[in-house]
Amino acid sequence: MKMAKNDDKKQLKCSFCGKTQDQVRRLIAGPGVYICDECIELCSEIISDEFEEDIQIDMTSIPKPVEIKNYLDQYVIGQEDSKKSLSVAVYNHYKRINSNNNSNDDVELQKSNILLLGPTGSGKTLLAQTLARFLNVPFAIADATTLTEAGYVGEDVENILLKLIQNADYDIERAEHGIVYIDEIDKIARKSENPSITRDVSGEGVQQALLKILEGTVASVPPQGGRKHPHQEFIQINTTNILFICGGAFDGIDSIIERRTRVSTLGFGAEIQSKKDKDIGKLLKQIMPGDLLKFGLIPEFVGRIPIIVTLEALDRAALISILKEPKNALVKQYKKLFELDDVELEFKDEALEAIADEALKRNTGARGLRAIIEETMKDVMFDIPSKEEIAKVIINKDAVSTKMPELIEAENGKRTPIKLKKSRTRKGPETA
């Protein structure tokens, strides 16, 4: 009888399926619980299927190019051709991911990263941010000027990917379908067209370091950022399906394009262009990969950003539209800020024109609009919270130059509360 009891005690079972240890290959013990190899395999399949299903849902509901452009139109004024080109490029990128995941075809679609080329304040960063928000994918912005070749003072290129992983809440699968915008990419051009004998750690060296992650590789990313060292653990991330958008002003490239195009228009019967015809925006539309090589990008780098989207400098009309038309227009933002203090804010059309003119004078594009408004209203925004008698502020043309907006007092000496409109919940993703 004692022998039988001992045998019963030794007969261990899986706590999930009930199979005994001699019915399975392996039985793993935990604190008061057992699990067999078959149950482990089943759990692994269920979890991996759920992950694949989640990613597939995100990737199969790709908006059409028209839908992408319509969304961009709500936030980005002008740049019609650029928005079309960008919408098509982004649609094809995520379509390629689905094709390579699902198709048994031998044809594998190759990755196409994007180069946004245009003057400061033309909307390059805004386009990339708006795209990521609409597609509901993780998004990261990196500054190319802070990057250096591995082993030198500065940031390694892998730190770009760390920002993306952090913005995806360390969900690697989600980060692998995100968008990375690398700004100031023109600042890492090598100093001359010919390869340098001396080491260019912040120019050509960075371009070389970026090649692998742009093309698609499994990168090792330090989880805390900083430099790599052999005794730390790394986060592994596959960059094959990450869309890289590089942006830069490329000051001076118009001269390179002009020299190239001028050669083809020499001789008898050639059309003589006036200075007015030599518009920088029109010149940029004629850009060729060879022009980027002459500017200082290496051939391998140019080959990994095959889609070139050019943006034009914003004119006076576009800047005025930017001030008042987009969903998050600056005029709407400042009106909302003043409403929170129960003060009405009014911008006269002449004031918007003066603000646009000042931005053109400073050559800062749309980026300088907020700074000009802040300068105009700095003193008013300082005083308003303390002055209960002020009910309305009017910004006219003179206020832009004198920094003294017109103030209107309340009839009874004290302003009445303004009922704020409840913001409607917008369909679609708000954050990336």
From Swiss-Prot:
One Pfam family it belongs to: AAA_2
Domain ClpX-type ZB stretches: 2-55
Gene Ontology CC annotations of this record: HslUV protease complex
Residues making up the signal peptide according to the UniProt record: none
Classification via InterPro entries: AAA+_ATPase, ATP-dep_Clp_protease_ClpX, ATPase_AAA_core, Clp_ATPase_C, Clp_protease_ATP-bd_su_ClpX, ClpX_bact, P-loop_NTPase, Znf_CppX_C4
GO molecular function: ATP binding; ATP hydrolysis activity; ATP-dependent protein folding chaperone; protein dimerization activity; unfolded protein binding; zinc ion binding
Swiss-Prot/TrEMBL GO biological process terms: cell division; proteolysis involved in protein catabolic process
SUPFAM superfamilies: Glucocorticoid receptor-like (DNA-binding domain), P-loop containing nucleoside triphosphate hydrolases
UniProt feature, compositional bias: Basic residues: 416-426
The entry's keywords: ATP-binding, Chaperone, Metal-binding, Nucleotide-binding, Zinc
Entry similarity comment: Belongs to the ClpX chaperone family.
Protein function: ATP-dependent specificity component of the Clp protease. It directs the protease to specific substrates. Can perform chaperone functions in the absence of ClpP.
Stored PANTHER family: ATP-DEPENDENT CLP PROTEASE ATP-BINDING SUBUNIT CLPX-LIKE, MITOCHONDRIAL (PTHR48102:SF7), ATP-DEPENDENT CLP PROTEASE ATP-BINDING SUBUNIT CLPX-LIKE, MITOCHONDRIAL-RELATED (PTHR48102)
Assembly and oligomerization: Component of the ClpX-ClpP complex. Forms a hexameric ring that, in the presence of ATP, binds to fourteen ClpP subunits assembled into a disk-like structure with a central cavity, resembling the structure of eukaryotic proteasomes.
Protein name per Swiss-Prot or TrEMBL: ATP-dependent Clp protease ATP-binding subunit ClpX
